[in-house]
Amino acid sequence: MATKRSSSHSKGSWLFLAKELPKLDWRVVNRKTEKPFKIVLLGSPDEQEQLMTMLFSFPHYSAQFFKDLLPQLPSFDRTHSEPYLIHLSDLTELADVINQTKDSLFILTMNSNLLVHTSQIPVFNWQEMPEAKTIHKMLDQFSGHAFALSFVFPLFRRSMIEREIKQTAMQNTTWVVSTSLPNLIPGPHQIFTAPFEAASDFVVLTINEFKLMMALTGLLGQKVQPLKLWMQASVVLAMAKTAQVSATQIISKVPAGGGLIVKGAVSYAFTRAMGEAIVLTWITGRVQSLSFFKNRLQAFMAEGKAIAGRLIKPR
């Protein structure tokens, strides 16, 4: 009987998911990546070339295992970036550029002798602070164009990818914890079955993963075109189903009072692992294995438990 109920429940989840997915507006990501902007590369021709090389560098995504999986990073075509760049060797033409440019604008330099302080536009000196801090500062100060920056220039992709995945993971964890709290009135003998039991959990989390998939597509410099996302969509669907099974295998059954933390932890780990799998699928052109997903799911469980615990018992 339990198997029959489980099968019926799973079928209902997938039917509801199929109904909800067409409602996702993929054009939202494209609008974010198409926001116009200009970067002024200020310096000598050699300095401008160094800045260009920097903009088209692609820092490894995160942990060492990514470096092992990506021994050779992809090369990038610079030609499409020219409409976004203004090359200046000195300050004489800067005022005209500021007055004539209608798009959002900021200055990037590595020559302290050419530093200009203006309240009109942000100025970033690449040699002023460590690379990672400069990238984060630029993205924070130019936040309305962060998606567009990542779409055009590989330099910003690692930071934006990490931000988007972590933000989605936090949203999912918060949602799972907050919707489960009213039901947390167990008897001393009661036990919780593993996460993703409710159709709403599975459907909402999977829809959020599709949103994340579309966001990561844009951040990796690709236009979101639903008919071309079949590979990534297969990753999301296959691993969402695997997450349902893995959740039970990882957690089995937990005593009353501990289920909610574990439930939140799995939703967090599920999103982090899914995000990594989508990124690697895009970069390598190969769908990541389910064993990869399970290993990454396990790797993020401890972090997920800590976050879920803080959400349940805020200090």
Please state what every model-predicted region is.
Residues 166-273:
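Membrane-inserting effector segments that mediate pore formation, membrane fusion
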Residues 1-179, 218-222, 228, 269-315:
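Terminal, membrane-proximal amphipathic helices
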